[in-house]
Amino acid sequence: VNNEYLNLLSNMKIPVVLVDRDVKYTGHAGVFIDNEYGAFEATKLLLENGHSNIALIAGPTNTVPGRGRRKGYQDAFKFMNIPVREELIFNGDFSITSGKLITRHILADYPDVTAIFSCNNHMTLGCISELMEVGKKIPDDMALVGFDDLPLVKIFHYQLTVVDRSSREMGYQAMKLMSKMLKG
């Protein structure tokens, strides 16, 4: 969502409900996920299960989800009084390819990593693909937590924990909000 698009919406003088893209200071209502909290809870779960060498396949730092999920990861370590290993934070681009390449790098250069937190479904698919190629079993050989649900993964019976953004629920809440706005 860029400024030109937001200005166009504002000038149209119609009710607008943004979904899943929290654009600050626009005056538009919206339904958003708390990226920071979701990443915090996912990372805390891994830490509580004995993992301390957790690699993060983060999104781009120029995106709200990328920054929020990275901060949630870092905050969970601080909350648990465990030092954050900054060298285990890798920037992906929300693509399958980046998830695969970063996972390959993690496996080659950081053998002490026991868990990976991947910050979106495409990068998680890339991570799964690389783990499968090298014969690593999830969760036996590598714990994996993803952000965004992956219904396809259930077909292969992976034990994968995900932060589910529930598009259906966000759409439902957005329609309730829009209905309320239209009723005045």
Per-segment meaning from a language model:
Residues N3-G184:
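Bacterial carbohydrate/catabolite-sensing allosteric modules
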